[in-house]
UniProtKB/Swiss-Prot annotation:
Keyword Transmembrane helix: yes
Protein name (database record): Olfactory receptor 2D2
Purpose: Odorant receptor.
Membrane topology, as annotated: Multi-pass membrane protein
InterPro entries: GPCR_Rhodpsn (IPR000276), GPCR_Rhodpsn_7TM (IPR017452), Olfact_rcpt (IPR000725)
One Pfam family named in its UniProt record: 7tm_4
GO BP of this protein: detection of chemical stimulus involved in sensory perception of smell; sensory perception of smell
Compartment(s) of residence: Cell membrane
Organism of provenance: Homo sapiens
Positions annotated with a glycan in the UniProt record: 5
Membrane-spanning segments: 26-49, 58-79, 101-120, 140-158, 196-219, 237-259, 271-290
Entries under Gene3D superfamilies matching the protein: Rhodopsin 7-helix transmembrane proteins (1.20.1070.10)
Amino acid sequence: MRQINQTQVTEFLLLGLSDGPHTEQLLFIVLLGVYLVTVLGNLLLISLVHVDSQLHTPMYFFLCNLSLADLCFSTNIVPQALVHLLSRKKVIAFTLCAARLLFFLIFGCTQCALLAVMSYDRYVAICNPLRYPNIMTWKVCVQLATGSWTSGILVSVVDTTFILRLPYRGSNSIAHFFCEAPALLILASTDTHASEMAIFLMGVVILLIPVFLILVSYGRIIVTVVKMKSTVGSLKAFSTCGSHLMVVILFYGSAIITYMTPKSSKQQEKSVSVFYAIVTPMLNPLIYSLRNKDVKAALRKVATRNFP
């Protein structure tokens, strides 16, 4: 037994969302439906922005980047979870687990940065409308989007390195449905304080700093909107920002609970992870499309053109 414990783990057993066969069948149907809506919703949003010239603006450029990150974020997790719901042996190789952890963090961290960039875009559009075209040029937009993806990659590489450098020689059972940092740290065969501190500091960089920037941006927006004499202008400004604010609250709220708060129960961690890893990517395109007149107009235009 001592020799077994000293052997490096080569695969992990994912305990999943449930161990009941009937519950797993129901979860498979629900997750499959959610994933299909996520894929179709985000692809539709990206396609609409691509084909409709009225949507060729900085706001929709960033929205396309967010939809792409959402799509990749969900695709990295859900298909594997669906396969495991139908499998008796829910095993994942160490290398594959490491790869999925890295991509999960990349797409998640990129979303954090993009949401902060989108709040800055709304701030400039509402607080400096006359200077907006000169400030948010396409060159600046590409730089901001590239910076978001780059920061997401850098933070993710640091987090993943600190997690994977730990020895895993004991239990290989992960009390989760995918390879997530907090669930993996529990299995490490050594002190994880340094790794936890590194993840916390990266969380400050990619979670708390963007949240602070978003709050500052929306604080300035609210002050500007309150000063507006036109009721129509105020309502339009709040409507434009409302969708983004809803997405920010949903994603950041659940992510901060997972990575920036004291450890909670395993069941609570899984529930929060389901929300921000599976549900939020599905809700984002729905929130932006259902609350956005431009997107709905583009959808009607495409529908009329193809189904007269």
